[in-house]
Amino acid sequence: MIIMDYYHMDIILYPNKNLQKSLTKRKCLKQPNIHSIKRLIFPPITETRLSKIMIDDESIKYITYNSSAQEITNIIMNNLENFPCPSHCSEEKWRLKSPDQRMKKLVITEMTAGVGGNVLNFAKYFKYVNAIELNCIRYKYLNNNIKLYDYSNVNCYNDNSVSLLIEKDDLGQDIVFFDPPWGGGGYKQFQNLRLDFDKYSVEVVCQKLLEKNHNKMVILKLPSNYDFDYFFDQLKSYTINKFDIEKMTIIVVKKY
């Protein structure tokens, strides 16, 4: 019998059938089935395609589950009421568009794409999605997962997102989303956590992004114990909205 160790993806062979049966039962009780985990994480898809979804252990720990990804998209949509008219639209037509119609005219860039937790939801609603992932393996998984959902409006980049968007300013978008690493499980011990992303603080990343003329909104996914007083003070020249959802806080920073 072959037993799959879900957490490390190791194959273990046991010659004793009784031992096999006992261990199999124990593992079934303790370990979630990888197929069931994928079903929770990713948007609805056929069982055949779901089995082809690629994800690594680290991503399972930190990925945005589908239900939360939808909540984040809804938050962005609800903040589009006063969003400036893009250059490719007429002011009159823009004013008449509903938030979901406006979203279909906008481009969002995900700076921390991973294997697609938020990207796959964004692709359903936005005109285009730029998905940036630095890790080569996750970049491969990201491309695979996007293809399984038949999305043709996602451009993937295996690169440093800070370099692309801030130092080079190579990509064009209306909205930027990023989920900076929270520092592992130890982040929970802090009362007023502050985070860096690449070589900048999270606050400086927001400032530098919003200095670019084409970026009108920046959305962040942060832990609930973040130092929000500091964040609000550093970005007080912008409009900031804070939304608490399960186990995380979504911050919307607007320059309009």
Swiss-Prot record:
GO terms for molecular function: nucleic acid binding; RNA cap trimethylguanosine synthase activity. It comes from the Viruses. Gene3D superfamilies: Vaccinia Virus protein VP39 (3.40.50.150). PROSITE patterns: N6_MTASE (PS00092). Pfam families: Methyltransf_15. This is Uncharacterized protein L320.
